[in-house]
């Protein structure tokens, strides 16, 4: 058969000579190999390949596949891997528009003739002994976007669909030695119109490539159904076996004990009494093994797959697993590694799944394509629910600048695209159908609607009655025309009140947010407004945060420094720039501060303490708390007085209450009962002692007695410009010209570099920018930064000197505010910022006083909510405690520098250097918010990348009365929720006390 490049622009040609999709069961030559999970029937072709790159087909060396064609002038390339990350072409990030937008005017199914890079891959190999004299197949687990394959000069086949296996038989052309495998990978094809996902546009062979041999008898496919009726497992398997053989099927438990056997060749049916059901909480798995033997009883092939007994269904309009209402505490996960892109490793996947289990995530949506097959095995074993999503997104064909315009949408109801999208659905289904973790099939993402997607839904339902079907795009079509496609109401970025409005209608359908809480930059504020709906509405069944990991690429900047780059940094145009950095973890797989909130609100163990009574509520569906230990501490002002550990078994779905009795409390101070629920023993995903949930009760014992002090009055110098207060081991100077405190010394060490400034501005977050807050709130930028100092007044009291500076804000309408310093004769300094409120101004970002301090004063410890950054709308996961850090460590790793490092509920903050020089800021009446950073808000805002920030010159300490929340409903228009905003007409005071630091 001759190949043609015409296939690249024909949507009706998406596979030539490709074998039928099948289950991803493992095959072995015998049971010993199966037990060791080391198959001689598989020959891995990963590694170094010969490679040549061409900008487009006209420059492509078309005869490279011929045996006589030399590869001496070829380069080397690593497989798996992307061309663009190995020096061929450049990475490009776009979200919804197609990558050729503005370069060429194209419409489906046509592609660029000028910009369609071609990678010519060549691999020479000898056949392993175990594969000789058998039928041999090749499996490409993932290739973007279209591929032609030759072996020893003979055309083998063609395939599209980047994210499911493409397999071909090589038997007629393969030799025992000296094989030349050639693969031409085209970056663009008609399939590119179906793969408009929000990700980097890569190309190449990015998943495993291997040969496998089919012996004289071979299990081509198996369909396993492991149902569960509440007591027993109902097992059935349909086997597709080629060749003459005897068949023995075995089901074994986790201990290897055989619990069922059969000699049926085509189908197996068992009832497993008192089977252990599978769930994310208790992922019980059984092993199904099929042994093929010859007439003499010799093993020909052993096939094996893991199965979990479970029943997922709609009951009275509610999604239920094994009879219980399920809540998805989910996240969207792109496959990504900062060094290798979507060519992720087993180590990446192990980190990811362990992270999810550690941080109470129970579900993943495979946005927006089937993931590496190993991921499903891990989800089965560790316990993660999956929405398995078809590789389909055509966002740019129907939405332009946010407006819905499906005038040239594909696939729509176009017959020429129908078989292509159905093939994608079938390929995903066939590969993943036996995985217990897959609960829902998704027809794709953001592809509008039409008869073609309706056909995908019909296919899933006809092929599989054990799972539900999902597609969010039906919500965008008028008159509910295609609502029948999906079994659930699924929306993206619906506000909490919009979700609640739907739930109040009681439509009879369950609700999920397949995407919510857009975690771009400093985000995830207001997550609790969604999780609170779990208790209010039975039909609310959770959601999937967008998203798991920043898609940022490790590269070198102009100075040779290794940095993480986002869209546009590779001169890629068009680009959506930093919109690819939406992860709860950074691209290097380090945690962002957002994890703290998600972990707390996603926990199935909820605890509360009231008047010393601890209530433990177990919201698990199946698991009790026997696998947990409870650690209780009594703390005073952040210092642990006493701790204890106890066990408490709370059955799933129940609560228990007990009295905490640790210590007699009689002395003055702020006390905290702190209880942690931790893993009692080591698990597959965490060490013993890993915290799952926590609770605190804060209470205060007051002493109304005022301590008597004998003060020696300091020297007060009333100069023409400077008022000085000089006492034992301290000195303060107040500048009537500058308008503030110009010197503060303790033990002759100076702490003031310049007069502290009142600020009403924060470095705008990504969410702020998306909501046009730089425009809406701009007056607050100038209000403080360019405020005019007006007057000063002072009053000498019995034990202090009070000095008040009055300023006029640089905005319209203008207003006055004051800063009062009260210099106590014992060396304490009270500071009070007084804001009376003003009408006619927009909401205020923050009310704060900024201290520009010496850079060596970069270590800090505080007693407040922590340990990680938190805000008024993102503090449910923070706890009161005594924490320490540095200014550098406190700079969050958001790739676009922005507001970060804030803490709420702060009682005391101490800043110090290595020599123990320092200051302590103590609350006056109410706790304050604060941050300690190496940069000012204005320096952060002026940089577009972390490596653009200047060399560190100072430590910036911000003490704030209040800062508005960070939001997160979306990053393109949703403001911070009303309850977390600061209204300009609201009077506010910021008060705190400065004293010298004591180590």
Describe each region flagged by the PLM:
Residues 1-15, 35-36, 50-54, 74, ...:
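Accessory beta-strand-rich segments of carbohydrate-active enzymes
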Residues 174-178, 240-315, 666, 671-712:
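Extended acidic/polar, glycine-enriched regions
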Residues 1-101, 180, 184, 531, ...:
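Accessory carbohydrate-binding/adhesion or oligomerization-edge regions at the termini
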Residues 3, 82-85, 90-92, 96-111, ...:
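An acidic-aromatic loop/edge-strand motif
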Residues 84-86, 92-94, 142, 187, ...:
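Beta-strand/loop-rich accessory regions of lumenal/periplasmic or secreted enzymes
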Residues 149-151, 233-262, 288, 613-646, ...:
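Beta-strand-rich binding/interaction modules
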Residues 195-218, 551, 560-615, 619-639, ...:
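Catalytic cores of secreted or luminal carbohydrate-active enzymes
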Residues 1-37, 193, 299-613, 620-626, ...:
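Extended substrate-binding grooves/exosites of carbohydrate-active enzymes
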């Amino acid at each position: 058969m001759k190949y043609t490049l015409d296939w690249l622009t024909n949507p009706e040609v998406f596979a030539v000579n490709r074998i039928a999709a099948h289950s991803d069961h493992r095959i072995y030559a015998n049971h010993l190999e199966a037990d060791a999970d080391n198959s001689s029937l598989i020959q891995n072709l990963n590694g170094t390949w010969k490679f040549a790159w061409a900008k487009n087909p006209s420059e492509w060396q078309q005869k490279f596949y011929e045996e006589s064609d030399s590869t001496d002038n070829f380069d080397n390339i690593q497989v798996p891997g992307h061309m663009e990350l190995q020096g061929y072409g450049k990475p490009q990030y776009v979200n919804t528009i197609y990558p050729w937008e503005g370069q060429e005017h194209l419409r489906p199914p046509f592609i660029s003739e000028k910009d369609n890079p071609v990678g010519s891959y060549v691999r020479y190999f000898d056949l392993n002994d175990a594969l000789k004299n058998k039928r041999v197949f090749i499996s490409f687990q993932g290739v973007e976007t279209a591929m032609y394959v030759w072996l020893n000069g003979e055309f083998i086949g063609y395939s599209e669909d980047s994210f499911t296996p493409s397999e071909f038989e090589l038997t007629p052309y393969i030799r025992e030695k000296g094989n030349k495998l050639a693969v031409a990978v085209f970056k663009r094809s008609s399939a590119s119109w179906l793969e408009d996902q929000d990700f980097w546009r890569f190309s190449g062979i990015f998943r495993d490539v291997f040969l496998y041999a089919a012996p004289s008898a071979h299990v081509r496919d198996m369909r396993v159904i492991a149902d569960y009726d509440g007591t027993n497992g109902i097992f059935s398997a349909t086997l597709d076996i080629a060749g003459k053989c005897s068949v023995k099927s075995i089901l074994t438990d986790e201990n290897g004990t055989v619990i069922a056997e059969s000699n049926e060749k085509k189908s197996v049916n068992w009832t497993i009494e008192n089977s252990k059901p599978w769930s994310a909480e208790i992922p019980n798995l059984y092993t199904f093994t099929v042994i093929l033997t010859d007439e003499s009883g010799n093993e020909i092939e052993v096939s094996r797959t893991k199965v979990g007994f479970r029943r997922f269904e709609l009951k009275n309009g509610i999604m239920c697993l094994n009879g219980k209402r399920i809540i998805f505490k989910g996240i969207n996960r792109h496959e990504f590694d900062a060094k290798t892109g979507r060519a992720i490793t087993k180590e990446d996947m192990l980190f990811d799944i362990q992270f999810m289990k550690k941080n109470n995530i129970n579900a993943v949506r495979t946005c927006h394509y089937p993931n590496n097959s190993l991921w499903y095995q891990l989800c089965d074993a560790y316990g993660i629910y999956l929405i398995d999503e078809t590789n389909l997104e055509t966002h740019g064909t129907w939405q332009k600048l946010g407006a819905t315009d499906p005038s040239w949408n594909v696939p729509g109801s176009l017959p020429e695209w129908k078989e292509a999208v159905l093939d994608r659905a079938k390929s995903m289904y066939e590969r993943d159908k036996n995985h217990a973790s897959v609960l829902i099939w998704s027809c794709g993402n953001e592809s509008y609607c039409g008869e073609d997607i309706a056909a995908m839904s019909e296919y899933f339902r006809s092929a599989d009655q054990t799972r539900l079907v999902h597609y969010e795009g039906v919500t965008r079509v008028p008159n509910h025309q295609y609502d029948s496609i999906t079994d659930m109401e699924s929306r993206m970025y619906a506000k909490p009140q919009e979700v609640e409005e739907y739930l109040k209608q009681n439509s009879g359908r369950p609700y999920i947010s397949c995407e919510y809480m857009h975690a771009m930059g400093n985000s995830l504020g207001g997550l609790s407004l969604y999780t609170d709906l779990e208790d209010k509405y039975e039909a609310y069944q959770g959601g999937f945060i967008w998203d798991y990991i920043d898609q940022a690429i490790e590269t070198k900047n102009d100075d040779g420094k290794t940095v993480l780059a986002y869209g546009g940094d590779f001169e890629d145009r068009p680009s959506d720039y930093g919109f690819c950095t939406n992860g709860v973890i950074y691209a290097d797989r380090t945690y962002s501060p957002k994890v703290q909130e998600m972990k707390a609100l996603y926990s199935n163990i909820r605890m509360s303490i009231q008047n010393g009574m601890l209530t433990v509520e177990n919201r698990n569906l199946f698991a009790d708390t026997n696998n947990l230990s409870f650690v209780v501490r009594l703390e005073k002002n952040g210092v642990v007085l006493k701790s204890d550990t106890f066990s408490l078994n709370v059955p799933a779905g129940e609560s228990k209450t007990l009295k905490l009795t640790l210590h007699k409390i009689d002395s003055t101070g702020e006390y905290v009962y702190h209880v942690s629920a931790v893993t009692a023993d080591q698990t597959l995903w965490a060490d013993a002692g890993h915290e799952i949930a926590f609770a605190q009760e804060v209470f205060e014992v007051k002493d109304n007695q005022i301590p008597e002090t004998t003060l020696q009055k300091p020297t007060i110098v009333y100069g023409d410009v400077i008022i000085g207060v000089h006492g034992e081991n301290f000195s303060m100077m107040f500048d009537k010209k500058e308008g503030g405190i110009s010197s503060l010394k303790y033990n002759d060490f100076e702490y003031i570099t310049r007069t502290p400034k009142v600020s009403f501005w924060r470095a705008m977050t990504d969410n702020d920018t998306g909501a046009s807050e730089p425009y809406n709130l701009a007056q607050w930028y100038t209000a403080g930064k360019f405020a005019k100092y007006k007057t000063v007044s002072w009053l000498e009291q019995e034990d202090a000197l009070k000095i008040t500076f009055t300023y006029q804000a640089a905005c319209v309408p203008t207003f006055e505010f004051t800063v009062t310093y009260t210099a106590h004769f014992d060396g304490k300094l009270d500071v009070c910022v007084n804001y009376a409120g003003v009408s006619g101004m927009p909401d205020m970002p923050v009310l704060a006083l900024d201290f520009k301090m010496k850079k060596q004063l970069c270590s800090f410890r505080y007693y407040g909510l922590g340990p990680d950054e938190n805000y008024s709308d993102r503090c449910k996961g923070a706890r009161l405690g005594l924490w320490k850090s540095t200014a550098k460590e406190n700079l969050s790793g958001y790739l676009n520098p922005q507001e970060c490092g804030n803490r709420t509920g702060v009682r005391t903050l101490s800043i110090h250097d290595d020599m123990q020089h320092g200051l302590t800021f103590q609350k006056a009446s109410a706790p304050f918010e604060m941050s300690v950073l190496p940069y000012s808000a204005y320096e952060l805002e002026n940089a577009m990348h972390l490596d653009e920030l200047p060399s560190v010159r100072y430590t910036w300490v911000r003490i704030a009365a209040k800062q508005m929340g960070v939001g997160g409903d979306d990053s393109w228009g949703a403001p911070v929720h009303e309850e977390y905003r600061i209204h300009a007409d609201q009077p506010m005071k910021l008060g705190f006390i400065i004293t010298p630091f004591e180590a």
